[in-house]
């Protein structure tokens, strides 16, 4: 911890913070435990827990605004991975509880003795990426995401954003630009950077001016960021949503138009469909594609499809994607097992 730091037994109510230099010994946290895994509405509970001790390169941040991601649902359900089983395997002491939350903005309240990039009082954005900076792969210039040490803070790693204070590594802290408010800043590093990587990382399929980009879940966190970033790059964002109210919201964020997926019935696995069933599926998928054409103003297939529903939608994404285009995935919220008709890659 830091010089001139005092500690208090007072527990501060959510929404209030102690003065800088004063650190409570305990805090409110929204936790999950092994015996509550299942329905996220009952798996998460408000508990009073002790604040964690800091190691030399760690930072204690008071959270001002936090984002919600689907990995919190996975953690609460205990599937596809039981994060409580892995609690304590990423350099932290094992705890009987787990604090989720993978994006936040806040204020630095304490630093380990080796921290030099931030200091007490700094407003910061927290990145969810956790890894060992001394990993040979990373030290040789490899992307941290491909390191065997890589994991997600607030999902695999404990002490996430769903608490009054979070413990993070120093490299996770980015100074908050004054142009961003706390809420905008909170969603920059998990949602915002994920979208940017999907649009800009892959050689040969980086977004270009005039590209149609199909965005599943357009009214969600990833979707709203994708709409705005696609517009900023000169692309044409088309959102897929579940209802006209969400569609109107997407248009207010800059979408060229939206497709209401509740008007279609071909979602789910195509495995086992007979010839007649496949014909019906193809007719629905073609009708879905025609709505893209109507919004785009011509027979323009998406150059990029931002996929995260997975099991129910991947076959449609491949069906509508432009030749030479890219379907890029960052999740599987409707199911991990997906089926595709490979003929759509080279025949149709």
What is the meaning of each model-derived region?
Residues 91-95, 102, 130-217, 264-269, ...:
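NAD(P)H dinucleotide-binding glycine-rich loop of Rossmann-like/cofactor-binding domains
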Residues 219, 227:
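N-terminal Rossmann NAD(P)H-binding glycine-rich loop of SDR-like oxidoreductase domains
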Residues 194, 221-222, 312-313:
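Hydrophobic/small residue at the entry helix of a nucleotide-binding pocket
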Residues 50-67, 80-139, 177-179:
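Glycine-rich beta-strand-centered segment in the early N-terminal region that forms part
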Residues 232-312:
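Adenosine-nucleotide cofactor-binding segment
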Residues 323-331, 340-348:
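Rossmann-fold dehydrogenase core element
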Residues 208, 321-322:
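Helix-to-beta-strand junctions that scaffold the AdoMet/dcAdoMet cofactor pocket
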Residues 217-218, 309:
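NAD(P)H cofactor-binding loop motif with strongest signal on the N-terminal glycine-rich segment
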